[in-house]
Amino acid sequence: MTHNKVVIIGSGPAGHTAAIYLARGELKPVMYEGMLANGIAAGGQLTTTTDVENFPGFPDGINGTTLTENFRAQSLRFGTEIITETVSKLDLSSRPFKYWLEGAEEEEPHTADSVILATGASARRLHITGEDTYWQAGISACAVCDGAVPIYRNKPLAVVGGGDSAAEEAQFLTKYGSKVYVLVRRDKLRASPIMAKRLLANPKVEVLWNTVAEEAQGDGKLLNNLRIKNTNTNEVSDLQVNGLFYAIGHIPATKLVAEQIELDEAGYIKTINGTPRTSIPGFFAAGDVQDKVFRQAITSAGSGCQAALLAMHYLEELEDTD
């Protein structure tokens, strides 16, 4: 059993930013970066992104994996201890907090005075044929992140979804694509009236009602065609597009705390006044695990900074009361 002042669970931009601040504050943070935790490699969703062009400091853009490697190197430089194991159980019912590692659930728990949960969220996927082949090679789950990438410029694109996110992403993509198709499984949008009105009024948008994606096709390197099916007639046809964007929601990685802390209706951790602070003193939630609105690398990093500063303050108060 080991005890640490502060433990970070997760290794995306939120986790590493928190680690950098805490390490520079000489609090000797320990990060559990996970081993395919939540089905994603250490580093989080950025590791599945090829070109990141909207993170400050990289005027020519940077590969997502390279960016996460830079985060990791910077965390290590200032003294963060990074452990490539997955936390499988977390007990927030008493202090110090207790946690167990995957494969060692029956052993004595490790403990920490403060915990920052930065486990992120994963995009919902359709799991259609060809999806894995063309993921980040024509298929994406973030139009804001990837829409401006050269492979999509002046090309026909498609968005899957019928809610506000789909409407917003489709309109965003009209800045770059020659045309944007919106695939809606039903005969009406779930989007709010004002968002639906804007979408339907956009001359570069065509909504394909009662339509689902069946198969992603291409040349083995980039997507160039989508097999679609009409849910009323079962007719299958081809839709020539160079980009397919999913806007069907995200799944926050809250399994560790789902029964211990309040979640919102979408499953995200509820925090206090827009900060990473939660209803449990000393436990903080940073990044996409508590952010269903922005979901950007830069906002996650900012959230990690806030969590670190709040954790520092909490630990100082804890020392004063001892």
Swiss-Prot record:
InterPro entries: FAD/NAD-bd_sf (IPR036188), FAD/NAD-binding_dom (IPR023753), Ferredoxin-NADP_redctase_2 (IPR050097), Pyr_nucl-diS_OxRdtase_2_AS (IPR008255), Thioredox_Rdtase (IPR005982). Pfam families: Pyr_redox_2. Its cofactor is FAD. It is found in: Cytoplasm. Binds 1 FAD per subunit. One of its GO terms (cellular component) is nucleus. The modification Phosphothreonine is found at residue 278. Signal peptide: none annotated. Its EC number is 1.8.1.9. It is an enzyme of class 1 (oxidoreductase). It catalyses: [thioredoxin]-dithiol + NADP(+) = [thioredoxin]-disulfide + NADPH + H(+). Disulfide bonds join 142-145. One of its GO terms (molecular function) is thioredoxin-disulfide reductase (NADPH) activity. Transmembrane segments: none annotated. FAD binds at residues 11-14, 40-41, 45, 54, 87, 145, 288, 295-297. The modification Phosphoserine is found at residues 192, 279. Homodimer. The active site is a redox-active disulfide bond. Belongs to the class-II pyridine nucleotide-disulfide oxidoreductase family. This is Thioredoxin reductase. It comes from Schizosaccharomyces pombe (strain 972 / ATCC 24843) (Fission yeast).
